[in-house]
Regions:
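Extracellular glycan-associated modules
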Residues: 1-152
């Protein structure tokens, strides 16, 4: 049985603009897509973050939804997959832990943002070929959280 492990860490900033700025503001628009394993989407009109996952059977499921994703702030996001459980961290808090997850196995292309999407920024995105420790997640967050943008 094929298994793989990975982690992705990055920072996302969403500017505050009115929903009529462009059509992307009225729909879920991709901010950071790790080959749909998962995809971070934001809807400005609803002020809602949704994290979607495409599974091995090519179905999509919602891993996490919140209307507490801070606009006009840098938000640290981490996807940590150990081969059996997918954990999602936002600003050093575990917000979702989904056991038995088998992401869709495909060549993965990571994309940041969407053409004519939501205004903001993405920085300090790192891919790890193994799951990372809780201590490393905390360090990735605390080491640059006071910087604007949060880069070394």
């Amino acid at each position: 049985k094929f298994q793989y492990k990975y982690a992705v860490s990055g920072w996302i900033y969403i500017d505050s603009f009115p929903p009529e700025t462009n059509s992307s503001y009225d729909e879920y628009t991709s901010l950071l897509n790790i080959g749909d394993k998962p995809n971070f989407l934001f809807n400005v009109t609803k002020n809602k973050l949704k994290i979607m996952l495409k599974t091995q059977d090519k179905n999509e499921s919602i891993l996490y939804e919140t209307n507490e994703f801070r606009m006009q702030n840098w938000n640290h996001v981490v996807v940590n997959y150990d081969g059996a459980t997918m954990d999602i961290f936002i600003n050093n808090e575990l917000v979702s832990s989904t056991p038995g997850t088998i992401p869709y196995n495909s060549n993965t292309m990571m994309t940041c943002g969407t053409s004519n999407g939501i205004y903001g920024g993405i920085c300090n995105v790192n891919y790890y070929k193994e799951a990372i420790s809780r201590a490393k997640i905390t360090w990735l967050y605390t080491s640059v959280k006071q910087l604007n943008p949060p880069v070394i």
